[in-house]
């Protein structure tokens, strides 16, 4: 099986890279092992919220020079040696909008998103259904009704309302009861956001839901709900807003996250619409190397039939997705045994304080400035690495996980397009 480009991993980075390549007419295949980290996403995407020394960042692009001094191995720092990062960021934003995603935010300045705990966190882009506020401004509501779903344990409205009250908001907490959900409620394992959304999205349930929300929010100017409506798109929520006559915003729930799934579905649909091939439920097990080039990939489902392409992209994720594997004494990349940025002594991998920066989160594949992975100190000629498999950054403490995924995806796609044009 032969393609122009094979991408290992179908998460945010892999899909974004595949979309950009397919938009330029490249025949791409994505080998995806299963559910990716987008199913755990809040629906907001971070670019850069904090520098490694702990300083908060309000304008991400203005902080890149300071970041390069503090963290030269950070993917942003490496990409800045080759191109202008602001161009990659702008293309990433445009790519998401071409996928049909209604997003708010800008790289010019972070904004605040409301979390399921009722606190605010800085971020770059958010789906339009998520409650947001200016970075240095007050929350834009005075009276808020936080409404949960009776029997739904993955969202606690009292916790959100209490946190909002601490911020000077007149917030109330309540639970709605909808008879249409009673069948799901009988089985707690079935009473999850995705299954609830399948019922709440039905047109026949819209009016009963609207009546219940109106009853519980009579004095509120805005309603906050758990993200349990609008499974595939926001149309059911828009229709509900029209009936209720008030703004309704969604807060992410415990996984699986409906907002994250919506991101994934939009990206995957765009990739396949452009002619890309997704191989779900498969995993690349090993690679065939000749003269520092990958000549074939062998996957679990295809056995001894190699997958061949002129260019390969490693977007296999971090520990969560098995893109990196940790044993008792080492961390390694399982397909090609690529060079890893890590620490030699296991005792140094983590800190006992759970909320302190954890060194292992910065572990990942080491690359050159073109994001070509190193193997024995030598860059592989036709392989690039993108997203969470990269080392040199802490996506949690620095608030840059999605930004690294999207910018590295666009960066590598543009390089591959240029290289293949020269080859032709």
Curated annotation (Swiss-Prot):
CC cofactor: FMN
Keywords: Flavoprotein, FMN, Oxidoreductase
Protein name as annotated: Anaerobic glycerol-3-phosphate dehydrogenase subunit B
Keyword Nucleus in annotation: no
SUPFAM superfamilies: FAD/NAD(P)-binding domain (SSF51905)
GO cellular component: glycerol-3-phosphate dehydrogenase (FAD) complex
Homology family: Belongs to the anaerobic G-3-P dehydrogenase subunit B family.
Recorded catalytic activity of this chain's protein: a quinone + sn-glycerol 3-phosphate = dihydroxyacetone phosphate + a quinol
Subunit description: Composed of a catalytic GlpA/B dimer and of membrane bound GlpC.
Entry's EC annotation: 1.1.5.3
Database matches in PANTHER family: 4,4'-DIAPONEUROSPORENE OXYGENASE, PHYTOENE DESATURASE
Class of this enzyme: oxidoreductase
GO terms, molecular function: glycerol-3-phosphate dehydrogenase (quinone) activity
Gene3D superfamilies to which the protein is assigned, alphabetical: FAD/NAD(P)-binding domain
InterPro entries, sorted: FAD-dep_OxRdtase_2_FAD-bd, FAD/NAD-bd_sf, G3P_DH_GlpB_su
Species for this entry: Yersinia pseudotuberculosis serotype I (strain IP32953)
Pathway: Polyol metabolism; glycerol degradation via glycerol kinase pathway; glycerone phosphate from sn-glycerol 3-phosphate (anaerobic route): step 1/1
Function: Conversion of glycerol 3-phosphate to dihydroxyacetone. Uses fumarate or nitrate as electron acceptor.
GO biological process: glycerol catabolic process
């Amino acid at each position: 099986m032969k393609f122009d480009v094979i991408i290992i991993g179908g998460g945010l980075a892999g899909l974004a890279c595949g979309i950009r390549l397919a938009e330029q007419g490249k025949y791409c295949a994505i080998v995806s092992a299963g559910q990716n980290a987008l199913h755990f996403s809040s629906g907001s995407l971070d670019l850069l919220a904090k520098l490694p020394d702990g300083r908060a960042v309000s304008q991400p692009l203005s902080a890149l020079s300071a970041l390069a001094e503090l963290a030269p191995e950070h993917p942003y720092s490496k990409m800045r040696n080759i191109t202008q990062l602001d161009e990659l960021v702008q293309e990433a934003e445009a790519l998401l909008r071409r996928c049909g995603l209604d997003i708010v935010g800008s790289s010019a300045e972070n904004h605040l998103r409301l979390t399921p705990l009722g606190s605010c966190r800085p971020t770059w882009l958010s789906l339009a259904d998520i409650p947001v506020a200016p970075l240095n401004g007050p929350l834009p509501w005075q009276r808020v009704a936080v409404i949960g779903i009776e029997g739904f344990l993955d969202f606690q409205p009292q916790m959100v309302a209490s946190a909002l009250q601490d911020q000077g908001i007149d917030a109330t907490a309540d639970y709605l009861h909808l008879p249409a959900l009673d069948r799901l409620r009988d089985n707690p394992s079935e009473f999850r956001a995705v299954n609830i959304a399948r019922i709440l999205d039905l047109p026949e349930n819209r009016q009963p839901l609207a009546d219940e929300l109106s009853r519980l929010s009579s004095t509120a100017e805005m309603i906050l709900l758990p993200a349990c409506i609008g499974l595939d798109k926001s149309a059911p929520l828009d229709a509900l807003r029209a009936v209720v006559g008030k703004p309704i915003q969604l807060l992410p729930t415990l996984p699986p996250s409906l907002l994250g799934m919506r991101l994934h579905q939009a990206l995957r649909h765009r990739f396949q619409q452009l002619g890309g091939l997704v191989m779900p439920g498969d995993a690349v097990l090993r690679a065939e190397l000749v003269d520092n080039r990958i000549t074939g990939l062998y996957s679990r489902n295809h056995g001894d039939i190699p997958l061949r392409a002129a260019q390969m992209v490693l977007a296999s994720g971090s520990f969560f997705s098995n893109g990196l594997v940790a044993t008792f004494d080492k961390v390694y990349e399982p397909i090609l045994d690529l060079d890893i940025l890590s620490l030699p002594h296991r005792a140094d991998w983590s800190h006992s304080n759970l909320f302190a920066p954890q060194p292992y989160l910065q572990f990942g594949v080491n690359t050159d400035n073109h994001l070509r992975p190193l193997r024995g100190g030598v860059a592989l000629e036709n392989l690039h690495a993108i997203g969470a498999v990269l080392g040199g950054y802490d996506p949690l403490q620095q608030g840059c996980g999605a930004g690294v995924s999207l910018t590295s995806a666009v960066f590598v796609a543009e390089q591959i397009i240029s290289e293949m044009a020269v080859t032709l």
